[in-house]
Amino acid sequence: GDPEVVFREAIDNFTDLRGQFSSSPLESNQLEQLDRLELWTRQAYQRLEELLKQRHDQGFIRECHGDLHLNNVVRLDGKWTPFDGIEFNEEFRWIDILSDAAFLAMDFAAQGHLDLERSFVSAYLEQTGDYQAVPLMRWYLVYRAMVRGKVAAIRSSQPNQTAQALRTERRDCLEHVGLAEQLTKSEAPRLWITHGVSGSGKTTGTEGLIQQQGALRLRSDVERKRLFGFRPSQRPKDEAQQQQLYSYSATQQTYERLAELASMLLRSGEPVVVDATFLQRRFRDMFQAIAAQENVPFRIVPFSADVSELERRIVERRRQHSDASDATLEVLRQQLDSLEPLT
């Protein structure tokens, strides 16, 4: 997990790839692509080296799976379960947990599902709160694509291969190299915020921005609870905890935390959608100012539904206990009374 080791392994991918095709040389444009990717990897590492060291010192290096692509994940008893982790090489196994997550995310993209790649990355960040790692995510995505490209190249050099098998492995290699270059580029940063009371469909509706626009989502319900030491699904057990989470001061702190995270993600070059009610104009103005400061486009996405439908959704959500939101019918009525409409 040492940054120097991670960097060496990343550069070794390029050296090994160039050597694997000595009997069937790469074309000039393919060699140029490798050169561009190696240069990008070196330059990105220089920018990220300090963050890599910080994560090493802060305990983000763990005994991980090490080979977490989709062929090594199965749905078992209703749960997604990884198997066949790397045991023969500690350097491949003791890694930043983000590297493991990036491997799976990359493989979604490799299978043609960039939408699932972004959904997984956004959900991973939402669950872990590891937003400081976002500047590293793209570097690890590219690294993992190159690892799979190298593995395909190694398979292509094994003896007694049929001509068809050689072509398949070579194509797989070059497709992963092409994906690596694609992953060096992100969607243009921009900022969306939602507007709507509880139950109006904000969380469901913003999935489209994640999958189609590549946005990373920040959810106020989740970040509010994280800020005050609660699990997302944990309900306040008494009036004291209710006040701790939902007082005027707590709401102000929650929006300030969302603003801090949104600014950080935008500066990392990522599009961001903030899923919160934004019923008060002052909070909408706060985020519009962030977009202006970061010089990115800003848009408010409104959500609404009939009151009867809002009530039905809230009752069903509380019955299932399936969401971080603690909204009740009383909260809904308060929101409808205090909502400041868009102008």
Name each model-derived stretch.
Residues K202:
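Conserved lysine of the Walker
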